Structure formats: structure tokens, C-alpha cells
Curated annotation (Swiss-Prot):
Descriptive protein name: ATP phosphoribosyltransferase regulatory subunit
InterPro entries: aa-tRNA-synth_II (IPR006195), aa-tRNA-synth_II/BPL/LPL (IPR045864), Anticodon-bd_dom_sf (IPR036621), HisRS-like_core (IPR041715), HisRS/HisZ (IPR004516), HisZ (IPR004517)
Family: Belongs to the class-II aminoacyl-tRNA synthetase family. HisZ subfamily.
Pfam families for the chain: tRNA-synt_His
Biological process annotations from GO: histidyl-tRNA aminoacylation; L-histidine biosynthetic process
GO cellular component: cytoplasm
Gene (name only): hisZ
Function as written in the Swiss-Prot or TrEMBL entry: Required for the first step of histidine biosynthesis. May allow the feedback regulation of ATP phosphoribosyltransferase activity by histidine.
Highest taxon above the source species: Bacteria
Quaternary structure and interacting proteins, as annotated: Heteromultimer composed of HisG and HisZ subunits.
Additional detail: This function is generally fulfilled by the C-terminal part of HisG, which is missing in some bacteria such as this one.
Keywords: Amino-acid biosynthesis, Cytoplasm, Histidine biosynthesis
Amino acid sequence: MTIPSSIEAPLPKGVTDFLPEKADEIACIEGCISRIFELWGFRRIITPLLEFQDVISLGMGEDLKEKTFRFDDRQTGRLLAIPPDITPQIARIVATRMLGYPLPLRIYYNGRVLRHAEVQSGRSREIFQSGVELIGLNSPEADAEMVAMAVEALRSLGLDNFKIDLGQVDFFRGIMLSSGLSASARNLLQSAIAKKDSSAVREILEKEPITDQAKEEIAVLPRLFGGREVLALAEKAAGNDRSKKALENITEVLEILDIYGVSDFLTIDLGEIRGLDYHSGLTFEGFVGGLGEAVCGGGRYDALTAKYGRPAPATGFAFNILALLKVLEKQPEMEATRTRDFLLFNLKEDRREALEIAQNLRDKGFTTARDIIRRDFDNSLAYAKRMNIRQMLVIGGNYCAEDEIYLVRVADRKGVAIKKMDLLRDDYSLKIEL
């Protein structure tokens, strides 16, 4: 099909082209987060874009399975899947490819996943993730490390108006499973509790043949969110061992997070199950003021690697890079766009000098593009500004002497002639004194 040049080429719903400015911002966010992961001792892993459906589905609940893109493999006849989540891939790799590595394993990744989404929802099908997995440690200290690292990464992006919302799925599951409720009633209640709809919760409970004590424990769940005062209220509702152990766990995690000095960024929500089906203990999500969706989320998943043949406790989380991008776009004081250093504008017929200077600057680590198209000074400067290049170097012409280069600051068109030998010194700085 021939697409007229006057219209935009169509894309499937839920995916986006990211032009250089946005691509720079995404790379900046990913780079900043990756730096934090590496400072905490994590090593990068790269997962494949395709998996066999029957293999990857071992690590997914029904919700993720329904969101998976599938198609036939012409080579094998088997069903292929584009992973909707990277954590099951990590579990497979750890269980089958990293048996010779000692535990604990500290792994991080940058990647993209695809998920089916309702067209009407306006949600993106493509999710950019930067995440970590800590495999082989079953301790509150490991859980606390994930939360503290999430806080540090968000602060490294210049954010301070965020909260990390802590949950504990075993607390919720313990109350639900000990209540005697049917599976259908538990599902209805889970939805109502997630909406903090106490009236709906009471209405559902009135129809259920369970004890009054069980009803009281469940009825309090929509109110179990806020600060640490929530723990005292939750303790009264925890009438089973599983929920009591969950409270002990989150209490110990909070004590460790106090040592990290991140308590001001924390809230607690024990009234619902956050995360995915494979989560099994402490979970958390991060929210930035003014944005309705989570910018990060994760938690403990102690049973996942066992599905691929290697039992090991684990915890981890991932950042939603596009959600963070929305946040940064609302913060004009943050400079996420990557600038380029030089555009080299050559007015001489001989290109040798321009080529040598450009390569010399690149060897010193400066990004340098040559304006190969023949155009005048003003048009080259306009091009540099549009492409977010900081400075333009002019070789030849009447702008300076033969042993000089004319250096122009693109933002305000101010220029100065400098000696070529000064430009090529190892200690050259981009700063121009005008």
C-alpha cells in the first residue's frame, strides 16, 4: 500500500514512535536508573523478545496469560509468545542457564514487553521496563533493599514528591483463606476492597455464611491504609498465623527502612493484593504526585523459579519508564533531553582538516557531527538549534584567522575565535567565555 506523504503512516493502537527528543529522555531515565542498580551491585542481563508459549506461561497467572501476544512458529509449529512480563523470563534463565552461579544473584534489565489492552482504555500495549531481581534471599533485609533502591533511583531523577506504598499479600490471603468464603465471594470482596468501598464489602459479607469474627476481620480491610498506625489496627484483625507472620515481616522491613532513612517516603496498604499472581510476600508500588498510575512496582515471589525446576526465594521490582517520562514532562526544571556537543560547519573546499578535527573531538569524548550539506551560516545554525546541538564550529571563511576556529554558542548565537591548538588540547572544556 502506498501511503501519501501528506498523512501520518498508521500504527497499531497502543504503540508509539519515539522521535530523537523523546528517545533521548527515555535513554536518560534508563541510564540514571541503571547506574543506581549497578551501584547496588546488580549486573545486567538481556532477555529474548520471543519465548515458547508453553514455557513462559509456567511463570504467569491467568491475568498475564490473557494479555499475551501469541503466534505460530513457522519453523517448529509451536506457539510463540511475546513476553508480557520480564520476571518470568528471569526465573527461567536463573533456573536453567545460571546453575553454576552462586546465590544470591543480583540481576537487572532494561527491556520492553507487550500486553493486550482494551482499545477504549487508551493504555499503551508496549511497556518500557527497567527492573532488578534478587534471587536466593528470603529475608526482610532483601525486601527492604528493593524498597530503598527504588527510593534512591527516584531521588536520583530529581523527584521528591512520591510515595512507596507497601503491602503484604500474605496478610490479605491469610484472612481470606481462613474465613471460609467461597472463591467467587473472595473475588468480589477483593474488587470491593481495592476500591475502598466499605458499603459494598458489608453488602457482600451479609450474604455469606461465615462467622461474625471472620466478617469483622474482612470488614476492616478497606481501612488498612495510611501510616504506621495501620499496623495496630491490622494486628486486631489478624486472627490466623499466616496474617500474623505477614505483619511481623512488614514490621521488620519497616525497621530496616528506618535505618536506610527512607521512612518519609513510605505508606502502608494492607487492604488489598498489589502486584501479580506470582507475588508471595511483601509488595510495593511507587506513585508520584499528579500521576494516577504507578511508576514502579514489585515484591517477593518465592515460588516462581521452582516452576522452572530450581526452587529459590526471590524479590524484585521494575520501573515503568513511560510513566516516569510523563512525570519528567511535567517538571520543566529537569533536563532529561540529551544535548550534542558540536556541529562542524566547513567553509573550505578541502574537507581534510574538518574530518581530522571532528575525529579528534570524538576521540576526546565530544559528540561531533559534520554539516555535510552545503548551506549558509544561518541555516546551519538553525539546524544545530533544532537538533539540540550546543555549539557550532566554523572552519574557514571570514570569521577568524587561518590558525583559528570560530566557535558559536547555538542558544544565543554568540561566538568567539579560538586557536585550533587550544580546541585540540586534552583539557579542552565546552565552556565558552564570551
